[in-house]
Amino acid sequence: MSVVTTREIANALNLDETEVQQQAMMAWLTEQKRRILQTRLEILARYRSASLEELEAKIADGEAPEHPAWEDLIVAENLSNRLEEINAYLRRLQSAG
């Protein structure tokens, strides 16, 4: 099995190799963003919350069980942080293109 390189794809499609690499990174980051958003949405839906703030309020008010809701909230917050990182990379790639 041979490895396909960005150079090979760029040459075959008569494109700039850097552009192929940027588009590949954008596509990968966009897919990661979609997965993160889906996972965060699943966590919020579990507690019928529209936002992290609402989930935190429900936990504080006793409307959601502390366990495992606190752990889920932490996971969702970490996902939000990762989402910010991905969005920053996407902005940089878009401005470079």
Task: Annotate the PLM regions.
Residues 2-27:
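Short, charge-rich amphipathic alpha-helices with coiled-coil/heptad character
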Residues 14, 21, 28, 35, ...:
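Residue preference for a single heptad-register face of alpha-helical coiled-coils
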Residues 22, 29-36, 40-43, 79-86, ...:
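Amphipathic alpha-helical coiled-coil segments
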Residues 44-66:
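Short E/K-rich amphipathic alpha-helical oligomerization segments
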Residues 46-49, 92, 97:
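Solvent-exposed interaction patches of small proteins and small membrane subunits
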Residues 59-61, 70, 81, 91:
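Charged, heptad-repeat coiled-coil alpha-helices that serve as long linker/dimerization "arms"
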